[in-house]
UniProtKB/Swiss-Prot annotation:
Domain of life of the organism encoding this protein: Bacteria
Source organism: Idiomarina loihiensis (strain ATCC BAA-735 / DSM 15497 / L2-TR)
Cofactor details (free text): Binds 1 dipyrromethane group covalently.
Name of this chain's protein: Porphobilinogen deaminase
Catalytically driven reaction(s): 4 porphobilinogen + H2O = hydroxymethylbilane + 4 NH4(+)
Gene: hemC
InterPro entries: HemC (IPR000860), Porphobilin_deaminase_cofac_BS (IPR022419), Porphobilin_deaminase_N (IPR022417), Porphobilinogen_deaminase_C (IPR022418), Porphobilinogen_deaminase_C_sf (IPR036803)
GO BP: any one term: protoporphyrinogen IX biosynthetic process
Subunit structure: Monomer.
């Protein structure tokens, strides 16, 4: 039986928190198991002076971790589900989806309570095209500026006056014990989250049955059902993690209620739709919702985004 588990992780405080959380859970579940972290930098961590959407490509934050597993330098990788591409390299798979933290976006400001309170010309920071398109659609009088860096860097930029407000994933702030910085949670009706937002996923080698057995107790079936529906929608749209796509699934009894959107980054056009159906068919529902959005014109919006990405890269 495996006595040692090596976790590949990014070096940011949030990534390390996530890896340490899984380390702690594994050690609690399997006394005597040695779990160590293997921190490394990814392309998305290194290129900090360019908007994420312009770096382009899928898996900006995961490729180096996957190479480490394939080369045998690490056994598993812990990811934010929203950063994880929908396809995996041969030999690797997403095995475990852990219990979800709050999936909503957080509004953070030192002077205003929520988006509705921001005056004309107020500057809002976000690196997400998904957040940008929803804010610009509903609040065209606001100025959206790109915001990169880790959570602490983003908060510092707000505190130094570069922005009137910033929008971050609530889950990251809560996990870093910075929940007191959340001025308000943005309702999903106002800012539909990214697929998988707030959930952690564990990737491992496809043929590593011992590792899968160790990870099995960390699986959260409810979160898995919801996130698989969201990811299936993203896959149907051929979306990466840096695209203006929102997907949010809720479980209502044994039914899934899935909402999705695709929008132009400037908020000029935002497509929305929703589906309901049995939880046992979560992924089919996600694919169905993608089809409905494509019929509304999602492909044209996304190809324009990809074209502008490639012209900047």
């Amino acid at each position: 039986m495996t006595q040692r588990v090596r976790i590949a992780t990014r070096k940011s405080k949030l990534a390390l928190w996530q890896a340490e959380h899984i380390q702690q859970r594994l050690e609690e579940l399997h006394p005597g198991l040695s779990v160590e972290l293997v921190p490394m930098s990814t392309k998305g961590d290194v290129i900090l002076d360019t908007p994420l959407a312009k770096i382009g490509g899928k898996g900006l934050f995961v490729k180096e971790l996957e190479v480490a597993m394939l080369e045998g330098r690490a056994d598993i990788a812990v990811h934010s589900m929203k950063d994880l591409p929908v396809e995996f390299p041969p030999g690797l798979e997403l095995h475990t989806i852990c219990e979800r933290e709050d999936p909503r976006d957080a509004f953070v400001s030192n002077n205003y309570k929520n988006l509705n309170e921001l005056p004309e010309g107020a500057v809002v920071g976000t690196c997400s095209l998904r957040r940008r398109c929803q804010v610009k659609e509903q609040f065209p009088h606001l100025v959206i500026k790109d915001l990169r860096g880790n959570v602490q860097t983003r908060l510092r930029k707000l505190d130094e006056g570069e922005f009137d407000a910033i929008i971050l994933a609530a889950s990251g702030l809560i996990r870093l014990e910075l929940g007191d910085r959340i001025t308000s949670f943005i309702p999903v009706e106002q800012s539909l989250p990214a697929n998988g937002q707030g959930a952690l996923g564990i990737e491992c080698r496809s043929d590593d049955d011992e590792m899968k057995a160790l990870l099995a107790p960390l699986q959260c079936q409810e979160t898995r059902t919801r996130v698989l529906a969201e990811r299936a929608m993203n896959r149907g749209l051929d979306g990466g993690c840096q695209v203006p796509i929102g997907a949010y699934a809720e479980l209502e009894g044994d039914e899934v209620y899935l909402r999705g959107l695709v929008g132009e980054p400037d908020g000029g056009k935002v497509l929305r739709d929703e589906v309901r159906g049995p939880a046992s068919k979560a992924e089919e529902l996600g694919s169905e919702l993608a089809e409905r959005l494509l019929k509304q014109g999602a492909a044209e919006i996304l190809s324009a985004v990809y074209d502008s990405e490639s012209s900047h890269s």
